[in-house]
């Protein structure tokens, strides 16, 4: 069986969540490439596939096993990055580097979500670093629409990193991190508005408004008094925008699903606000 056939089989196994078998098949494909200075595209694809397999396994594992699997994933994504940089077609090279940087960012993000305290903070910082590199590479893509789309993905992940950090932090640090999250999500929204495909633009704007609403809701739950009230108002405003965008989606089933999400989050806003108000009434 040739290298391409083995890669194809390996990726099919990955899609079926047979990760151990996929890893074995992809390593078999890599072993068939005797001259590692040749077949760079194939090697790039193999390393990306191995990174994805180990990442999926790491997310499900616990303790030292999870840590080791994350290490394996990072190693393969680093290998992919080195190969992507060697690709002769500059635009393809940039695109593959973007995928590798995203993979690395995702590895550290998922580790950070499992960790606590200083370790979690450090891992989030690594994730941000890789997502920033992803963003920088995305801005260099010649195809404007693809460049916008890839920048949207990077801004979304940066926003998510800061949002999850902010939830774990307290006081001024939490407030500052929420501010960073909002900043990236606002940039995501502005980029989404520039997409030429109207339906894709609406979907991406919807996603950004959801992220913004979620940020303000979490801040509101941590805040007190008038500050909390104002933040709840901002959360409601963004989820209302999310709802309006969802109503404009042409795919009826997707539109209904997105409207359900928006209505659910609006309900959460009012519910959380009522709970806090009730607590303050009891206090006084």
Report the location of each language-model feature.
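Conserved alpha-helical positions within TPR/SEL1-like repeat arrays
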Residues: 7-15, 42-59, 95-110, 149-164, ...
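Short helix-adjacent coil turns
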Residues: 17-18, 65-68, 88, 122, ...
């Amino acid at each position: 069986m040739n290298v391409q056939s083995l890669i194809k089989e390996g990726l099919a196994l990955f899609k079926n969540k047979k990760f151990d078998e996929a890893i074995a098949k992809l390593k078999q494909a890599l072993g068939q490439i005797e001259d590692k200075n040749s077949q760079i595209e194939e090697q790039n694809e193999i390393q990306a596939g191995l990174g994805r397999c180990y990442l999926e396994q790491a997310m499900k594992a616990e303790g030292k096993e999870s840590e080791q699997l994350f290490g394996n994933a990072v190693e393969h994504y680093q290998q992919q990055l080195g190969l992507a940089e060697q690709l002769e077609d500059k635009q393809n090279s940039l695109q593959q580097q973007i995928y590798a940087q995203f993979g690395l960012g995702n590895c550290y993000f998922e580790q950070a979500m499992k960790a606590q305290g200083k370790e979690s903070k450090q891992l989030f910082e690594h994730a941000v670093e890789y997502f920033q590199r992803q963003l920088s590479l995305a801005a260099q893509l010649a195809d404007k629409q693809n460049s916008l789309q890839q920048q949207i993905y990077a801004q979304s992940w940066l926003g998510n990193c800061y949002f999850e950090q902010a939830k774990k932090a307290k006081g001024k640090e939490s407030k500052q991190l929420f501010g960073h999250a909002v900043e990236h999500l606002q940039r995501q929204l502005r980029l989404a508005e520039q997409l030429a495909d109207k339906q894709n633009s609406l979907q991406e704007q919807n996603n950004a408004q959801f992220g913004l609403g979620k940020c303000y809701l979490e801040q509101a739950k941590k805040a007190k008094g008038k500050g909390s009230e104002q933040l709840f108002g901002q959360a409601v405003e963004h989820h209302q925008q999310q709802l309006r965008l969802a109503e404009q989606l042409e795919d009826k089933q997707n539109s209904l699903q997105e409207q359900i999400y928006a209505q659910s989050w609006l309900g959460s806003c009012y519910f959380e606000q009522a709970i806090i108000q009730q607590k303050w009434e009891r206090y006084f």
